[in-house]
């Protein structure tokens, strides 16, 4: 059911969203031009804001904030502004309170995307000080730089599971590394595989790995370029097994995707939320639609 059951008006533009479950309640984390908003959405029809963290940089120039959580802490980055910071917030006591435990630009100022491999306590900061920087979170409130990657112009986004990092490298395609040996500065990851030539190859923007690790859904951020499903069961022989789109407009752009079970959730720039059944990855079918322009 794609009926809208709750909403919240705010006098600024929203950008990124994230979600956490804490103390038997569910929370939505949403970025805006002013900072980070945390909503209790346990009952989505009566959601309400429980906390707000002002950004280090605010105003209409803020287009990108990004989030990930680990060990009861929320990690916040922003891709705009010379006064931006890395913010770490203790959210373990939600909905009652939060506590900003770190707010500084010592490690990074701007950063486009952040992803945490929770199984290995490593934070991947995309397009920050280098193409991508990796930090140890052995102490969650004191990240320690353990690796900087400059093998490409920049890494736009990353998906990491158990030290296997799927890196979206813009016009330089997809690269997959193993970071299990990277624990301190000087250590080097192992390149497992890469894909630079494929149908509708453009600006390799984002992707998500299936629960079983066999499939990878990938989006190139170009007008009219299809979503791709990749067979990554053998990273030495990555293959595109299907391509598809929303069917709305030949110039539409698929932005970000998340896989949950057999469903692929795609946010489009103009076509809203689209959900595809990928139980047959060779023949995905569109099953749910929500028009965010309504």
Ranges and model annotations:
Residues 1-294:
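Feature marking well-ordered beta-strand scaffolds used for ligand recognition
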């Amino acid at each position: 059911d794609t009926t809208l059951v709750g909403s919240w008006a705010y006098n600024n533009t929203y950008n990124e969203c994230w979600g956490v479950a804490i103390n038997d309640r569910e929370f939505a984390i949403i970025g805006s031009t002013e900072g980070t908003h945390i909503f209790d959405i346990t009952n989505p029809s009566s959601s309400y804001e429980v906390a707000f963290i002002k950004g280090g940089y605010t105003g209409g120039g803020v287009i990108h904030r990004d989030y990930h959580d680990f060990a009861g802490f929320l990690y916040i980055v922003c891709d705009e502004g010379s006064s931006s910071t890395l913010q770490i917030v203790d959210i373990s006591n939600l909905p009652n309170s939060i506590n900003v435990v770190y707010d500084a630009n010592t490690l990074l100022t701007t950063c486009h995307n952040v992803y945490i491999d929770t199984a290995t306590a490593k934070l991947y900061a995309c397009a920050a000080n280098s193409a991508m920087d990796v930090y140890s979170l052995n102490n969650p409130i004191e990240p320690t730089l353990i690796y900087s990657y400059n093998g490409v112009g920049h890494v736009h986004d990353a998906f990491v599971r158990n030290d296997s990092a799927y890196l979206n490298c813009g016009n330089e395609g997809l690269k997959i590394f193993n970071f299990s040996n990277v624990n301190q500065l000087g250590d080097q990851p192992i390149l497992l595989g890469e894909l630079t030539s494929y149908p509708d190859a453009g600006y390799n923007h984002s992707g998500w790995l299936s629960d079983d690790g066999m499939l990878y859904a990938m989006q190139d951020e170009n007008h009219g370029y299809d979503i791709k499903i990749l067979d990554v069961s053998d990273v030495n022989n990555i293959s595109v097994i299907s391509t598809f789109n929303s069917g709305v407009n030949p110039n539409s752009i698929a932005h970000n995707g998340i896989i949950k079970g057999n469903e692929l959730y795609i946010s489009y720039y103009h076509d809203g939320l689209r959900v595809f059944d990928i139980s047959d990855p060779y023949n995905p079918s569109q099953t749910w639609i929500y028009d965010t322009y309504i």
